[in-house]
Structure formats: C-alpha cells, structure tokens
Amino acid sequence: MKAPFTSLAGFRAVFETLPQVDAEAVEAATARNETLTKPKGALGRLEELAIWYAGWIGDGRPALERPQVAIFAGNHGIAARGVSAFPPEVTVQMVANYRAGGAAVNQLCHVAGASMTVTELELDRPTLDFTVSPAMTEDELVAALAAGWEAVDDESDLLVVGEMGIGNTTAAAAIAAALFGGTAAEWTGRGSGVAGSALEAKTRVVAEGLERHADALSDPLEVLRCLGGREIAAMAGAIARARVGRTPVILDGFICTSAAAVLHALTPSALDHAIAGHVSAEGAHPAALARIGKEPLLDLGMRLGEGTGAIVAINILRSAVACLSGMATFAEAGVSGG
C-alpha cells in the first residue's frame, strides 16, 4: 500500500483516526475459549494471546497463516565514531548474507513459516553524525517512514520488523534517552560487543547527541529525525502501517523497541496491536519495554536484533491460535465440563 503521507504532518495525521480492536471478535474468542476442553485458564498466557490476536484479525476463530518478517537496513554516520565492534561495511555484507539465505534470521523464518523481505535504505549514503547535525532531513525521514509503510504485505496476518545497521544501538540509546529521560549511560549498552573504553566512547557519543539536539527533543518525530536512522524510521513506518491495517505485530529487541517508542510517544494506542516477543540481553531493553507497557514473552539472552527474538515468538503465538481455533469444545467432544 502506498504511504498516504508526504510530510511529517501527514504522518502525524495517521494517528488521529486509528481503528480499534474488533470487540465482537474478542467477545466471540473469549466465549469460545470458555468452552474448550481444558480447565479455565489452564493455558495461561496462551489464552490471552489468542484472544488478543483474534481481536486484531477480526475473527473469533482465527488462523495464523501468513506471517511476514520485514528487515530494514541502513547506515549511520555515527559509525565512523567507533561506536560498534564492526565496521560500517558489514551492513552491506549482511544484506548480501540475508539474500543468500545464510543468516540466523533466514533459518528462524524457515522454522516459523514466515516470509522475509529485505529493504535497503540508501546504504551508500549514511545518515549524518548526530553529534554534529540532525541525522536526517525531514524529507529523508519521511522517505524512510514511507519505505517501511510500503514494505508491509497487505495480505500478511502478522508482522515482525527487524533491522541491520552498524551503529544502530547507539541511535536507539539516544532515542530512548530523549523519549524517556535519564542519562546516556542508563540507556547505552554493549550492542555488538563493545566494552571498556569503547563503551565509554559510545556513551559519550549518545550524550553529545542529546546535548546537541536538546531544543528539539520534546517532539517524538524530531527525536527520530535528529537521532535515529533510516532503518529505525522504516520500522516505525511499518509498525504504523500495521496499526492502520489492524495487523498484529510482534516487537523484537532494543532497536525495534526504540522505533515503536516513537509511535507510543505520539499516542499510546499506536501500539495496541503489538506485543513484545522477547526481552534482549541489551541492558536497557527491560526498561524500554516497561516504558511502553509491554511484557515480553521470552527471555533467552538474545541480543542479535534483526527481528530474531520476535521470530522465535511467532510459534508461541501460532500455538495459542491453534488451541483457540482447533480444540474441541466440551459439547463437541462429549466431555463433561467442570
């Protein structure tokens, strides 16, 4: 679907008339769940997940058949400041690895039965160093938001977004600090594996960016423009598109959460269609999830990004939906109810 906006004002307008969850589907799914051949509540959070999914899909007996994983790749000017354990050229190299099927995300998509798309966002033109100037112009931000919006398959019934971009945990830390408050040190973690003096330098870069753009940080989209990256903006655009289309979303790690947090700061209901697939080993992720009101499904010590933790959670949601829609009721099975 072509993005219905050509400016940041147009993107903001998207959130003025967001569709609501289908209350009739929620009621039907809840009623059906009460009649299934199990003690009430015996499937725990799986029951909540299935009813949540039913409401957004709009079907009291839903199916999960077309999950999409949308990966976005972008390069960051701040990567030249040595904030990552890997050089900037790794972004392009990893995109090639995705297309060749050799990355972890490819294997996990196969196991989860998910399609995978990769969108490259001007990899030959990194964003600017946000300690010197805004990372993006307004036009560049709008283009990245639109690229994310248009990458979503209208036929998908679940969306996971992931990212590749050397330096993007630095951008995510800056976004989180700007949106949530606190110091650069509270939000800056090891990312790709930096430690010691390298982590200290990364933290200084985040602090410098926050100071440089202090006058712009009361506006969530200005936070994204000044401190973010194209792939982070594209994830925000994709999540927004899913919200408008009532497509459920599973959020991934810290970088994905920073993108989602921008939307949450615009209006908290922007993330009603989203759940957190996991909590990552990036130190600030639990705090970021708490700030947007999301309880993670998994805690596996993962910190790869790229959508991987959320993809692992797809089969948890698939299991929940299968039980709601496939189990027999007490009446159908001829089993006496409790």
UniProtKB/Swiss-Prot annotation:
<keyword id="KW-0169">Cobalamin biosynthesis</keyword>
<keyword id="KW-0328">Glycosyltransferase</keyword>
<dbReference type="InterPro" id="IPR003200">
    <property type="entry name" value="Nict_dMeBzImd_PRibTrfase"/>
</dbReference>
<dbReference type="GO" id="GO:0009236">
    <property type="term" value="P:cobalamin biosynthetic process"/>
</dbReference>
<dbReference type="Pfam" id="PF02277">
    <property type="entry name" value="DBI_PRT"/>
</dbReference>
<comment type="pathway">
    <text>Nucleoside biosynthesis; alpha-ribazole biosynthesis; alpha-ribazole from 5,6-dimethylbenzimidazole: step 1/2.</text>
</comment>
<dbReference type="InterPro" id="IPR023195">
    <property type="entry name" value="Nict_dMeBzImd_PRibTrfase_N"/>
</dbReference>
<dbReference type="InterPro" id="IPR017846">
    <property type="entry name" value="Nict_dMeBzImd_PRibTrfase_bact"/>
</dbReference>
<dbReference type="GO" id="GO:0008939">
    <property type="term" value="F:nicotinate-nucleotide-dimethylbenzimidazole phosphoribosyltransferase activity"/>
</dbReference>
<feature type="active site" description="Proton acceptor">
    <location>
        <position position="306"/>
    </location>
</feature>
<keyword id="KW-0808">Transferase</keyword>
<comment type="similarity">
    <text>Belongs to the CobT family.</text>
</comment>
<comment type="function">
    <text>Catalyzes the synthesis of alpha-ribazole-5'-phosphate from nicotinate mononucleotide (NAMN) and 5,6-dimethylbenzimidazole (DMB).</text>
</comment>
<dbReference type="InterPro" id="IPR036087">
    <property type="entry name" value="Nict_dMeBzImd_PRibTrfase_sf"/>
</dbReference>
<protein>
    <recommendedName>
        <fullName>Nicotinate-nucleotide--dimethylbenzimidazole phosphoribosyltransferase</fullName>
        <ecNumber>2.4.2.21</ecNumber>
    </recommendedName>
</protein>
